[in-house]
């Protein structure tokens, strides 16, 4: 089983997500990540990947996979904020040293 860690930024974003159906889908995708099923994931850059959830606004969860053992959920957003979210995820990864 893969260990999943989350930043405070990601946890707050998910807790404040008003779209309950999307929140449930994101939580299900995270459970699948734990089992090793990454599904629709795209490499963005600098080791950061984008987990795409096709629900509501088209949500994205940005993560860093460390040797397939630990996945760190950095931040998230929707298709509209994608460009800024990628920059934020890369900065968080550098800040965390991952």
Regions found by a protein language model. Give the residues of each.
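Enriched for short, Lys/Arg-rich terminal
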Residues: 3-4, 23, 38, 56-60, ...
